[in-house]
Curated annotation (Swiss-Prot):
Span of the signal peptide: none
Further comment: Hepadnaviral virions contain probably just one P protein molecule per particle.
Biased composition (Polar residues): 223-239
Catalytic activity from the UniProt record: DNA(n) + a 2'-deoxyribonucleoside 5'-triphosphate = DNA(n+1) + diphosphate; Endonucleolytic cleavage to 5'-phosphomonoester
Function of the molecule: Multifunctional enzyme that converts the viral RNA genome into dsDNA in viral cytoplasmic capsids. This enzyme displays a DNA polymerase activity that can copy either DNA or RNA templates, and a ribonuclease H (RNase H) activity that cleaves the RNA strand of RNA-DNA heteroduplexes in a partially processive 3'- to 5'-endonucleasic mode. Neo-synthesized pregenomic RNA (pgRNA) are encapsidated together with the P protein, and reverse-transcribed inside the nucleocapsid.
Lineage: Viruses, Riboviria, Pararnavirae, Artverviricota, Revtraviricetes
PANTHER family xref list: POL PROTEIN (PTHR33064), RIBONUCLEASE H (PTHR33064:SF37)
Region (Polymerase/reverse transcriptase domain (RT)): 346-689
Gene this chain is encoded by: P
GO BP of this protein: DNA replication; symbiont-mediated suppression of host innate immune response
EC number(s) on file: 2.7.7.7, 2.7.7.49, 3.1.26.4
Location of the region described as Disordered in the Swiss-Prot/TrEMBL record: 186-273
One Gene Ontology MF term: metal ion binding
Protein name: Protein P
Domain Reverse transcriptase span(s) in chain numbering: 356-599
């Protein structure tokens, strides 16, 4: 006869009609009873032969990916021009006086952030954009390219120009070494004096650093190229004769970098293309040797900057290798040939764009180190997309980076800190990760990009067609033409217009701000926001500012005070270059929603949406069917979040933890499911701990227990000797039930830790319920007044200690000790300070 739910509740002492606690509770530590109950509830984990269940409601195993849904109408979010002030420490010091060592250390960590992986694996460009949506390959390609372009325009990415140089938009930092080695040479007269090594057919002179130049005609590069004149005949002749075997175009691209120390072969392979393009091509077209098959393939390098206006005269020119524009000269192969699309516009714009600033970078290969793809911005906002960057290579394998640990406030610390009668609001930092600048030295390790549309499509469509009559001049150009591609591009043409041409070229980009896909980023963001909040708290001592990652909350005594605080703090953050999203500022009144909890003066509870998820989970939980342990991980993750608010807490979930650890399937018996259901139906708030003096002490030996409650002493013995930790836990439970005190002194570290998961299962569950809301103070055995009674000696009285208890706020480093602050004029308005009135700082 399996154990009924009512009987089980009685065993667990959750019902009123249990006998005296001193008799009942030690029985729960009995191994035999625990084994029998576990067998009755099917908690021992036999090897089950029934097939496992791999899905419960929305929960699948941790590593099985849910199929993402592609939205062709995703909007790319816009990013403000985020530029964090470089002298952020000085700015803060002007605001609040000298900073503490802690704050300075944290702010120095992120100005700039550095990234040193042990080893970096480079992937071919084809893996730059992940084929995550096989039915929307082309659409996803362009949406992702557009997202990357938007990030580059916002100064969040570098664009790799050559092996050793990159360009970016936005304001430069002092650690980004700009290249100013020479200016655009206006006419041929000055070039005649240059030696061959320092110039090559219309490039500016420069010393042999592998880098590109910021020229004074940069803007013309992006618009119609009116200021670029063709070279005169003498120059062309000269460059042609020097560069034997290299086809010399009539126009030269910008910023190409022949290096003085290298020979003609190297120059041919590197300088005959726009900034980074030939290197990209070498990666993208490994089957064409850049040098030997230069004029025949038309694939090896791209000659950009052919004025779009000269479409008519292009037939007389040599074939240029921009894949997109090549269609202009070719015969349509079918009704769905890309030639029809390319001929829609006269001016397709430049093949490549360059940033306002050019900087020197460490040697960066034409490869990527992580793939990117798009997903919904969040479950509530499916209209906008979010870029997911997969840099998981740095968290895997033998060369994985062990990311720094940082303090996450636990539930009790949070409650101690934020549970008060303050008014709250939370600030939304827009694109928080993209505030923190990365040193350019990290660029070679954090590369994203794409191989260009032609390669991307070719890799995905295996059935390439070769059209014989065109073989020879334009090999395989029309292989990519297909109805699907044509229709997709025509639709995308409405969205992106002539940018289709720009986006169809290969590109390699490195991160200039910290990306979200690296384990270092959460750590850096947490350090940064906690330092800023520490500064804000000292500037406004009568208020509370607290942050976890990009979630910043402000609290004040009254709504009017909160509004004036909001204005001041917002202005301060804006002056540092931190961008806030005013539309997403939330005013919470007296119950703050933070980190999944609702925190008010009564304590904390889980937010409503989490309660709904738990209800939903129990509704779909199958009984008497083995459930895959990976699904159990998901279930435990959800239930574990709300466990501190239940009667029995984490110990109630121990059978599930055990099955996950042994990688076995778990079967819910009706009684165990009913027990958990009831546990999660009524949630109790976790209250703030109060400081006070400890008056109640407990102690135990394996054979007996003793209590000191004020001047009263009590003792008792156990029927059979018990392990010492179990005995100490029982003594603490007796102290709580006898005295009702919320503060108990004990000399046992396991009881102090309040983790009851290692005790016999039934005892752990019952003790959690009895000791809920109790705070413990450590008292050394020698001074413990309950020590003598536990050894059976009631006559000797040790003096009662005056042991003060201070609630902790964990390692959340809330209170920085303020150095002396220069005196300021007194505030005209005096607000009653919550620090003095509402609660004491720990």
């Amino acid at each position: 006869m399996p154990l009924s739910y009512q009987h089980f509740r009685r065993i667990l002492l959750l019902d009123e009609e249990a006998g005296p606690l001193e008799e009942e509770l030690p029985r729960l530590a009995d191994e035999d009873l625990n084994r029998r109950v576990a067998e009755d509830l099917n908690l021992q984990l036999p090897n089950v032969s029934i097939p496992w269940t791999h899905k419960v409601g929305n929960f699948t195993g941790l590593y099985s990916s849910t199929i993402p849904v592609f939205n062709p109408n995703w909007k790319t979010p816009s990013f403000p021009d985020i530029h964090l002030h470089q002298d952020i420490i000085n700015k803060c010091e002007q605001f609040v006086g000298p900073l503490t060592v802690n704050e300075k250390r944290r702010l120095n960590l992120v100005m700039p952030a550095r990234f040193f992986p042990i080893a970096t694996k480079y992937l071919p460009l084809e893996k730059g954009i992940k084929p995550y949506y096989p039915d929307n390959v082309v659409n996803h390609y362009f949406q992702t390219r557009h997202y990357l372009h938007t990030l580059w325009k916002a100064g969040i990415l570098y664009k790799r120009e050559t092996t050793r140089s990159a360009s970016f938009c936005g304001s430069p930092y002092s650690w980004e070494q700009e290249l100013h080695h020479g200016a655009f040479l206006d006419g041929p007269s000055r070039m005649g004096e240059e030696s061959f090594h320092h110039q090559s057919s219309g490039i500016f002179s420069r010393p042999p650093v592998g880098s590109s130049i910021q020229s004074k005609h940069q803007k013309s590069r992006l618009g119609p190229q009116s200021q670029q004149r063709p070279l005169d005949g003498s120059q062309q002749g000269r460059s042609g004769s020097i560069r034997a075997g290299v086809h010399s175009p009539t126009r030269r691209p910008f910023g190409v970098e022949p290096s003085g120390s290298r020979h003609a072969k190297n120059i041919a392979s590197r300088s005959a293309s726009c900034l980074h393009q030939s290197a990209v091509r070498k990666a993208a077209y490994p089957n064409h040797s850049t040098f030997e098959r230069h004029s025949s393939s038309g694939h090896a390098v791209e000659f950009h900057n052919i004025p779009p206006s000269s479409a008519g005269s292009q037939s007389k020119r040599p074939v240029f290798s921009c894949w997109w524009l090549q269609f202009r000269n070719s015969e349509p192969c079918s009704d769905y040939c890309l030639t029809h699309l390319v001929n829609l516009l006269e001016d397709w714009g430049p093949c490549t764009e360059h940033g306002r600033h050019h900087i020197r970078i460490p040697r960066t290969p034409a490869r990527v180190t992580g793939g990117v793809f798009l997903v919904d911005k969040n479950p509530h906002n499916t209209a906008e997309s979010r870029l997911v960057v997969d840099f998981s290579q740095f968290s895997r394998g033998s060369s994985r980076v062990s990311w720094p640990k940082f303090a996450v406030p636990n539930l009790q610390s949070l409650t101690n800190l934020l549970s008060s009668n303050l008014s709250w609001l939370s600030l939304d930092v827009s694109a928080a990760f993209y505030h923190i600048p990365l040193h350019p030295a990290a660029m070679p390790h954090l590369l994203v990009g794409s191989s260009g549309l032609s390669r991307y499509v070719a890799r995905l469509s295996s059935n390439s067609r070769i059209i014989n009559h065109q073989y020879g001049t334009l090999p395989n150009l029309h292989d990519s033409c297909s109805r699907n591609l044509y229709v997709s591009l025509m639709l995308l043409f409405k969205t992106f217009g002539r940018k289709l041409h720009l986006y169809s070229h290969p590109i390699i980009m490195g991160f200039r701000k910290i990306p979200m896909g690296v384990g270092l980023s959460p750590f850096l963001l947490a350090q940064f926001t906690s330092a800023i909040c520490s500064v804000v708290r000292r500037a406004f001592p009568h208020c509370l500012a607290f942050s976890y990652m990009d979630d910043v909350v402000l609290g004040a005594k009254s709504v009017q005070h909160l509004e004036s605080l909001y204005t001041s703090v917002t202005n301060f953050l804006l002056s540092l270059g931190i961008h806030l999203n005013p539309n997403k500022t939330k005013r919470w009144g007296y119950s703050l929603n933070f980190m999944g909890y609702v925190i008010g003066s009564w304590g904390s509870l889980p937010q409503e949406h989490i309660r709904m998820k738990i209800k939903d989970c129990f509704r779909k939980l199958p009984v008497n069917r083995p459930i895959d342990w990976k699904v159990c991980q998901r279930i435990v993750g959800l239930l574990g979040f709300a466990a501190p608010f239940t009667q029995c807490g984490y110990p109630a979930l121990m059978p599930l933890y055990a099955c996950i650890q042994s990688k076995q399937a778990f079967t819910f018996s009706p009684t165990y499911k009913a027990f958990l259901c009831k546990q999660y139906l009524n949630l109790y708030p976790v209250a703030r701990q109060r400081s006070g003096l400890c008056q109640v002490f407990a102690d135990a030996t394996p054979t007996g227990w003793g209590l000191a409650i004020g001047h009263q002493r009590m003792r008792g013995t156990f029927v059979a000797p018990l392990p010492i930790h179990t005995a100490e836990l029982l003594a603490a439970c007796f102290a709580r039930s006898r005295s009702g005190a919320k503060l108990i002194g004990t000399d046992n570290s396991v009881v102090l830790s309040r983790k009851y998961t290692s005790f016999p299962w039934l005892l752990g569950c019952a003790a959690n319920w009895i000791l809920r809301g109790t705070s413990f103070v450590y008292v050394p055995s020698a001074l413990n007044p309950a020590d003598d009674p536990s050894r059976g000696r009631l006559g000797i009285y040790r003096p009662l200690l005056r042991l003060p208890f201070q609630p902790t706020t964990g390692r959340t480093s809330l209170y920085a000790v303020s150095p002396s602050v220069p005196s300021r004029l007194p505030d005209r308005v005096h607000f009653a300070s919550p620090l003095h009135v509402a609660w004491r700082p720990p």
